[in-house]
């Protein structure tokens, strides 16, 4: 019986001990007195850190840059070459006059073996898709719900036409890229796949499966491409690609894929329609054929960034080392740090 009473007496003591321990931990947390590591940055440790950063970043940069260079690209600027000689001095007349033929043929020579899939991009330069008025001129709710969503004032000045609402509304949709390309090799047409060129998340969650183009490009001023009114927006992937606005003034957008290998020395014939007006703002248009690698497409920026950071780290470590050898300074008393850790 006494043993039972003894155990009952110990229970309150144990619970009070736990409460005091929790309150002490809470007090230390609130007063910022928790145990912490407070390293002392000595010259040797700083030099070592910068040197290690250089030894790690430079190999990563070389590997990344090598992988980027393994991606093969063919780049062809066609916006000037596709203008007839008599219109070179008046490009706006050429692009705005519908009676002037816009068809053009370009020949791209394959320098290195290009393994399928070969991605087709169009590139626009000096095109500010990130302009605030341009970016805001859209209605994401309308793209998802169609006419069920009527608050489209943000789409001005392309909100309505002839008194009827426009679907899809806004300047971004109105100015959609409308140059077209067909490819052939040795008089044999190359099939271009235009499926799965848009992000899956965009197709499934940002563009409605029951939303169809209505009253689109029916105004007096036609901006760019027209959309098939019989196909829902979620299935018009070239439109979905265009609606993802770029952050920089030069950008690429995926047009399609060639699912055949291209051998060195072969010539790819490109028949294109030069419809899109970039001449009014001194823009440029380019056609790109590109392979991919384990990092994606060709982009030297990441590799160069690693090399610059790694090289800078080594240079900084060498400068610190020379300064330390030339003007050494005695270490300060760090006993205060040891005392705080022990407490």
Swiss-Prot record:
Glycosylation site list: 103, 178, 191, 218
Location(s) in or outside the cell: Membrane
- UniProt keyword Lipid metabolism present: no
Q: Which InterPro entries match?
A: CDC50/LEM3_fam
Keyword annotations from UniProtKB, A to Z? Glycoprotein, Membrane, Transmembrane, Transmembrane helix
How is it placed in the membrane, per its record? Answer: Multi-pass membrane protein
- Show the Pfam families listed in the entry: CDC50
Q: Which family does the similarity line name? A: Belongs to the CDC50/LEM3 family.
Record protein name field: Putative ALA-interacting subunit 2
């Amino acid at each position: 019986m006494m043993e039972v009473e003894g155990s009952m007496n110990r229970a309150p003591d144990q619970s009070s001990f736990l409460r005091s321990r929790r309150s002490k931990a809470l007090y230390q947390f609130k007063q910022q007195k928790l145990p912490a590591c407070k390293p002392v940055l000595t010259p040797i440790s700083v030099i070592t850190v910068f040197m290690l950063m250089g030894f790690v970043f430079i190999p990563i940069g070389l590997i990344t840059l090598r992988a980027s260079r393994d991606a093969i690209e063919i780049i062809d600027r066609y916006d000037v070459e596709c203008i007839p000689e008599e219109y070179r001095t008046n490009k706006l007349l050429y692009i705005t006059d519908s009676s002037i033929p816009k068809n053009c043929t370009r020949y791209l020579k394959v320098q290195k073996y290009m393994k399928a899939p070969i991605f087709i991009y169009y590139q626009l330069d000096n095109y500010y898709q990130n302009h605030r008025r341009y970016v805001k001129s859209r209605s994401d709710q309308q793209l998802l719900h169609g006419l069920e969503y009527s608050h489209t004032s943000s789409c001005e000045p392309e909100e309505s036409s002839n008194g009827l609402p426009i679907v899809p509304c806004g300047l971004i949709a109105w100015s959609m890229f409308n140059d077209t390309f067909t490819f052939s090799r040795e008089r044999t047409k190359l099939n271009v796949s235009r499926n799965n060129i848009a992000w899956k998340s965009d197709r499934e969650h940002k563009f409605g499966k029951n939303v169809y183009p209505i009253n689109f490009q029916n105004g007096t001023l036609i901006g760019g491409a027209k959309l098939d009114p019989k196909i829902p927006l979620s299935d018009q992937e070239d439109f979905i690609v265009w609606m993802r606005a770029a952050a920089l003034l030069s950008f690429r957008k995926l047009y399609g894929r060639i699912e055949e290998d291209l051998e060195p020395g072969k010539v790819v014939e490109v028949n294109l329609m030069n419809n899109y007006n970039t001449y009014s703002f001194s823009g440029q248009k380019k056609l790109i054929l590109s392979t991919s690698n384990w990092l994606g497409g060709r982009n030297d920026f990441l590799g160069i960034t690693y090399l610059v950071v790694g090289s800078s780290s080594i240079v900084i470590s060498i400068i610190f080392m020379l300064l330390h050898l030339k003007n050494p300074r005695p270490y300060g008393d760090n006993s205060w740090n040891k005392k705080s850790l022990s407490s």
